[in-house]
Amino acid sequence: MPETMRLSNLRDLRSGDRVNLERTLRLMDGLDGHIVSGHVEGIGVIAKCRQDGIANVVTVKTPPELMRYILHKGSIAIDGISLTVTDVTEDT
């Protein structure tokens, strides 16, 4: 658990804070999209959000040591939501 506390925002939570809990996916449940699996490797900061037609573009400032894992057309997850990477800069 020390690694979870170090790599997530759980250390910032206090008693009474609201958190997102989701029901377990059952095998017979339908999916709208795809399953996100993986491990938390770090915390990014949402630097900017803007609308581009029907799309929402989210700019995430990412720790430098994680940037080598962020690939154009790859994916990241924010709060369990899978997002496609459309542009990669030095730190976003």
Locate the predicted segments by residue.
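Conserved loop->alpha-helix
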Residues: 1-92
